[in-house]
Amino acid sequence: QMFTNNFDPVAFEIFSLSVRWYSLAYIFGIIFGWLYCKKILIKDDIIQKLFEDYISYLIIGIIIGGRLGYVIFYNFSYFLNNPIEIFMIWNGGMSFHGGLIGIIITTYLFSKKNKTDIFIFLDLVSIAAPIGILFGRISNFINGELVGKVTNSDWGVFFPDYDDKLRHPSQLYEAFLEGIILFILMNLIFFNKNYKIG
């Protein structure tokens, strides 16, 4: 029996405002990534204090960069004709690459302002990032986007909102490889090699 992806992209509604799984993925990714850095990775008291201030820069970079990346890279002509919709992020539409660029820019600005090494914070983000990637790819699967190639395999999935073909659940492959495996590898390097952030 093949699995059919009939998930609703909307997790729940609050006062007629739809809260999507993709939004929750960002929220959970940021929260768990922040907790992991605070409780496990950061040992220096000064960096702990700076990281408290840095997290707001990080969130701004993720949201603005991710949204602008989606607008520019994926649907520029549409948003050029409907500019007000650029601000409607609750309707979905974020870019991983745009978010990455946003993080680098806001991290640079924060480091320059506080006269600290930019690589301290980029290292922390890169070690914790697979947590966010895991949640993000799972939400991609729920949304039925970034689908894989056509397959006849037993674990193929139907994405009825995409087409009527059986496809690889590539989002779950990426969640496993880029989320779980990458997280393990990054942390093995960090802890086994006595790696110093920065």
Q: Where do the PLM segments sit?
A:
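A feature for loop-to-transmembrane-helix boundaries and adjacent hydrophobic helices
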Residues: Q1-G198
